Every structure is written in C-alpha cells, then in structure tokens.
Swiss-Prot record:
Binding note for cofactor: Binds 2 Zn(2+) ions per subunit.
Protein name in UniProt: Aldehyde reductase Ahr
Requisite cofactors: Zn(2+)
Function noted in UniProt: Catalyzes the reduction of a wide range of aldehydes including aliphatic fatty aldehydes (C4-C16), into their corresponding alcohols. Has a strong preference for NADPH over NADH as the electron donor. Cannot use glyceraldehyde or a ketone as substrate. Is a relevant source of NADPH-dependent aldehyde reductase activity in E.coli. The in vivo functions of Ahr has yet to be determined.
Residues that coordinate or bind Zn(2+) 1: 38, 63, 152
Pfam family, one: ADH_N
EC number: 1.1.1.2
GO molecular function: alcohol dehydrogenase (NADP+) activity; oxidoreductase activity, acting on the CH-OH group of donors, NAD or NADP as acceptor; protein homodimerization activity; zinc ion binding
Record-linked InterPro entries: ADH-like_C, ADH-like_N, ADH_Zn_CS, CAD-like, D-isomer_DH_CS1, GroES-like_sf, NAD(P)-bd_dom_sf, PKS_ER
Gene Ontology BP terms: fatty acid metabolic process
Binding-site residues for Zn(2+) 2, renumbered to this chain: 96, 99, 102, 110
Transmembrane segments: none
Signal sequence range: none
Length: 339
C-alpha cells in the first residue's frame, strides 16, 4: 500500500508540516477518497491546539472534504458508491452500526463513540478514508469549490431546522453572522422563512441582508431586543461567547425554541417561568447523520445555496490557518489540494 502525503501538526499549536503515513490495508467497510478540496473549520484549530484534551500527534486535521472515490473495501462494493464518483466527508468518519443509536438512524450519537474524521487522519491530505456510510454522494450540480463547509458548518445549522420542523412560514432568528451564521441565513432564506440576524457589527448589515436576512438587529441594543418579545418560532445561537440570554428567551413565541450550536463554555441561566409560561424550550445539537447530510447536499444543490468562501492552495495551509485564527475569513476558508 502506497504512502499518503498530508500536512500534520507534530505538537499542540505547532505549524503544519509535510507528513507521509502508511494507511495500512483498506478495511472492508472503508472507502478511500482522493481529496480535491477541504475546508478549514474552527474545530480543526481546536484539535491542532489540543483545546479539548484528546488530540493525538502527529495530527492530520481537516473534515470538510470534497473529493472522488478511488477505492472501495470489499464490504463497500454494493453500497451505491463507485470509483470516480464525487463525494463528501464531514466531521464523522465511523460509527459502530449496531448500537441502538445507529440502528435507529441516529449514528451521530453512536453509543460506542462516533469516530471524528480528524482522529481517523483527516482531509489536509491527498487522500483519506472513511466508513462507506459516512461518505456522502454529491449531486452533480453542486458547486464543489464551496461545498466542503456544508459538511460541517452547514449541517450544524441545518440540523436544528429539521429537529424543530421549520417551514416557509417560520420566523427564525440567528445569533452571530460568521462561518455558521451566514450559512444558516442562506438556508433559511432558501426555505422561504422570515429571517432576523442578530449581529454586534453594524458594518455587516448590507452584506447580511444580501445573504437573505429580512432584518438585522443590533445585538448590543437592549431596546431593539426588547421590541422583539414573543416573535420567534426558533432562535439559533452560533456564537461561543456568553451573552445576556434573557432577551432572546423572551423573544420566543409560545412553543418557541432557543437552540444553541455554539459551544458556550459558561452555563446558560434560564428562568423556569420563562419556559413554563409559553411552552418554550432550550436545546442543542452538534452535526448530523448520513441521511441528514444527504438531504442537506441535495437541498443546497437544488436551491443554489453555497457558503461564502476564500480559496487557498493546500501548499499555503499555514497561511490559510493564520487567516482563520486572525478572524479575517469571509466567511469560510477552503483549501485546494495541490500535491
């Protein structure tokens, strides 16, 4: 088996270096994919820096992969995938397939522990491997250069829309207009929802309106927030910093839900009466299942929803990562493989 070229962090916080590794024999259930494009997500930086305490080095990050099938394991031969087919791989590379969560179609919550693509050797490489279930066929008309971020950032904000049965008549608010929030706005606009963006940066207003928001509200203006009481069926939080959440809880209509995908480290303080009085709820989620990923990619292709991206050659990966670290990305960075 030939070696795979990649870019790896050799230590926590280190710059990425060229690294070759032996992938071993192809597992029966695995698919090997040639990488064409791979997005950079803040989770990649967290893993490179070992923020979560379980990174293993050398670490090959990257989990927003667009590529082509180059090999199929013996148990992946008749699963609807073909050599040469365009596919995507997101945050998860493996799940056990036999626990209650997997059998019920909730593989992302695999009781044996769904294996992140990064822990499996990720997409900052010429090739990578994943279980066939997590290799997502792509529609022919999807824009492959910008599609990678849909496989992590996109599914992260699409999942709540499925969970809470959002329709064209829903009124939805989005807190934070960054890599996640801007995709949420585009998806909601494509669905026909009434979309309100909450942003602390007034300079973004015209750009956010052009993405499909119906209204932009200054999240630092208490009076503007107070005026929205009782309006929203769903508010999605995409930021990972602590805010005064009470005005957002009060902005929910009866039966409304506050859903966080932003990993806020401090506890959310929710007065019980705020929830009880209007049948309101608070929830959260991470990414999605293979089925949900397929639904997202089909919807994005049909509706022409594409993340706003900046393209770097993979050979300039350290420059691209620094660009993300500096908060300069508009709004997601994608690497083009050039091995």
């Amino acid at each position: 088996m030939s070696m795979i070229k990649s870019y790896a962090a050799k230590e926590a916080g280190g710059e990425l270096e060229v690294y070759e590794y032996d992938p071993g024999e192809l597992r029966p259930q695995d698919v090997e994919v040639q990488v064409d494009y791979c997005g950079i997500c803040h989770s990649d930086l967290s893993m490179i820096d070992n923020e979560w305490g379980f990174s293993q080095y050398p670490l090959v990050a990257g989990h927003e992969v667009i590529g082509r099938v180059v090999a199929l394991g013996s148990a992946a031969q008749d699963k609807g995938l073909q050599v040469g087919q365009r596919v995507g791989i997101g945050w998860t590379a493996r799940s056990c397939g036999h626990c209650d969560a997997c059998i019920s179609g909730n593989q992302i919550n695999c009781e044996q522990g769904a294996v992140p693509t990064i822990m499996n050797r990720g997409g900052f490489a010429e090739k990578l491997r994943a279980d066939w279930q997590w290799v997502i066929p792509l529609p022919e008309n999807i824009d492959i250069e910008s599609a990678g971020p849909l496989l992590c950032g996109g599914i992260t904000v699409f999942k709540p829309l499925l969970m809470h049965h959002i329709t064209a008549t829903s009124r939805v608010g989005v807190i934070g207009i960054g890599g996640l929030g801007h995709i949420a706005i585009k998806l909601l606009h494509a669905m026909g929802c009434e979309v309100t963006a909450f942003s602390s940066n007034p300079a973004k207003e015209q750009e956010v309106l052009a993405m499909g928001a119906d209204k932009v509200v200054n999240s630092r203006d208490p009076q503007a927030l107070k005026a929205l009481a009782g309006q929203f069926d769903l508010i999605i939080n995409t930021v990972n910093v602590s805010l005064d959440w009470q005005p957002y809880f009060e902005a929910l209509t009866y039966g409304g839900n506050f859903h966080t995908v932003g990993a806020v480290l401090t506890p959310l303080s929710v007065p019980a009466f705020t929830l009880i009085a209007g049948d309101r709820s608070v929830s959260g989620s991470a990414t999605g299942t293979p089925y949900e990923l397929r639904k997202l990619m089909r919807f994005a292709a049909r509706s022409k929803v594409a993340p706003t991206t900046e393209l770097f050659p993979m050979s300039k990966i350290n420059d691209a990562i620094q660009h993300v670290r500096d908060g300069k990305a508009r709004y997601r960075v994608v690497l083009k493989a050039d091995f």
